[in-house]
A protein has these predicted regions:
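Active-site beta->alpha loop and helix N-cap motifs at the rims of alpha/beta catalytic domains
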Residues: 2-13, 17-146
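C-terminal alpha-helical cap/extension of soluble enzyme domains
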Residues: 7-18, 36, 40-41, 202-205, ...
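A general structural signal for well-ordered alpha-helical segments in protein cores
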Residues: 30, 62, 66, 91, ...
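Alpha-helical structural signal in soluble globular domains
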Residues: 40, 64, 68-73, 97, ...
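Residue-level detection of beta-strand scaffold positions
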Residues: 44, 68, 72, 136, ...
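Short Asp/Glu-rich motifs
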Residues: 56-57, 91, 117-118, 148, ...
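Glycine-rich phosphate-binding "P-loop"
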Residues: 140, 162-163, 273-274
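Catalytic alpha/beta core domains of metabolic enzymes, predominantly
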Residues: 144-250
């Protein structure tokens, strides 16, 4: 396994984008959040994903937040940048026109809304990977895209030298199991589901890109590291401790719950951009109780 792939094993964190009360980006809080997850034992960062509310950022804000995350990280960990589109040519142009110096790879989501066929998905990602100067990690999340990438399609794409892995967020465990059992070791299998991640890792996956690890990187990293070391008992102990929190932060959707948790930790304001809204008083109270006791 090459050096980059080995660095992308373990716990990646799907980073939030902090906002101020006036909905502008809180660049100072980006530094606080980055320091928090790194000190908690995260292995790498993922910016401009779903959790980062990327669809609400202007192009100028995307450029500035990229710079801010890179500066805050200060070369301590690899950083993956999220870039996706339901227009293949637009995505290729966007990748090649963007300054991505400092990023290790691109996380690219399955095209959404227009629901391509499996052959369309294969052609889309093949063309993107062949045109990209950076390695591509596929991202399958059918609950958001309304399009599932079949594991046999992923297997075909894994033969492309510039496609180095997949974040698999299909809740059907048989899908990630197929990939674990049929891909080569130089293709990363990354869970995209906080709740089942340790079970996937115990079965042979390489790690997780986690939402919950924004708030509790220490416990989450210990859970995943225990699983990577084959320690089923220890991994399950951490799972039992943090699973109530995982359920809470997804109760009203992501990133509503995790933003509430980060506020309780004093790391940022509990502010989201419309059409997303902050957590209800009831959920905020439950999250506050967990954070104060964990």
């Amino acid at each position: 396994m090459n050096t980059l792939l080995s660095k992308l094993k373990g716990t990646g964190v799907a980073m939030i984008t902090p906002f101020k009360s006036d909905f502008s980006i809180d660049y100072d809080s980006i530094k606080k959040v980055v320091d928090h997850v790194i000190s908690g034992g995260a292995n790498y960062l993922v910016v401009h994903g779903t959790t980062g509310e990327t669809s609400t950022l202007s192009e100028d804000e995307k450029v500035e937040t990229r710079k801010c995350f890179l500066k805050a990280n200060d070369n301590r960990l690899p950083i993956i940048i999220g870039m996706g589109s339901n227009s293949t040519n637009s995505l290729i142009n966007y990748i090649n026109e963007s300054n991505l110096n400092g990023f290790s790879a691109i996380l690219s989501v399955v095209p959404y809304y227009n629901r391509p066929s499996q052959d369309g998905l294969f052609q889309h990602f093949s063309k993107v990977a062949n045109a990209s100067p950076y390695p591509i990690i596929l991202y399958n999340v059918p609950s958001r895209t309304s399009c599932n990438m079949d594991p046999t399609t992923t297997l075909r794409l894994s033969k492309n030298k510039n496609i180095i892995g997949i974040k698999e967020a299909n809740p059907d465990i048989t899908q990630i199991s197929f990939l674990i059992n049929n891909t080569n070791e130089d293709f990363l299998i990354i869970s995209g589901d906080d709740e089942s991640a340790h079970r996937s890792v115990l079965s042979g996956a390489d790690g997780v890109i986690s939402v919950a690890a924004n708030a509790i990187p220490d416990l989450f990293s210990k859970k995943i590291n225990s699983a990577l070391n084959g320690n089923n008992k220890k991994s399950n102990e951490f799972f039992e401790k943090i699973n109530p929190f995982i359920k809470l932060i997804y109760e009203e959707g992501n990133p509503t719950g995790i933003k509430s948790a980060m506020f309780e930790l004093g790391l940022c304001e509990n502010v989201l951009r419309l059409p997303l809204v902050s957590s209800s008083n009831d959920l905020s109270s439950h999250i506050r109780n967990f954070i104060s006791n964990y």
